[in-house]
């Protein structure tokens, strides 16, 4: 199955990746800043601790460690995350498509994983959206099962897919650099 990003011309892919990466970093910075009040001894990873709490008792402990303002910041962070998930998933998806293209051109291993992993990034964003819904439900309606369990399940899938996409993108980037270096060496040996 083709990915929509495969239709983007190569030169435009580079520009699009740069823009998406810069937006991802900017939003990550803003969300980390918003998340500072969420870091407590009970929730050392802030919102991520909340995502992975996994049961009602742990969620109650985390919510009790946050004052009213921290809970408002958590809500703001979860709302902003809906924009963030569109940006980060598209950035990593495009990087996966580009990595697959680069690996195919160099005849390295696993070029065909680029497209499925690109789709996987948008799947990660869907899991992120469900996770956020579960967390927003908890913040607005109270702590009830199965919402903490749903959040942890979705966060686990999300982070796994993101990690696979980032590792594959790095692999493709290393392959691209190696191929570029090899071409330079060939050009130098044939003046």
Predicted regions and their residues:
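Interfacial loop at the N-terminal end of multi-pass membrane proteins
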Residues: 2-77
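Juxtamembrane loop-transmembrane helix junctions in multi-pass integral membrane proteins
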Residues: 4-12, 65-68, 72-75, 105-115, ...
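Interfacial segments of alpha-helical transmembrane regions
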Residues: 14-21, 107-123
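Multi-pass alpha-helical transmembrane bundle typical of ion/small-solute transporters
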Residues: 27-33, 66, 76, 152-160, ...
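Hydrophobic alpha-helical transmembrane segments
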Residues: 76-99, 166
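Structural signal for the C-terminal ends of transmembrane alpha-helices
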Residues: 96-104, 174-178
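Alpha-helical transmembrane segments of multi-pass integral membrane proteins
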Residues: 119-174
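Short, highly charged, low-complexity non-transmembrane loops/tails of multi-pass membrane proteins
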Residues: 179-191
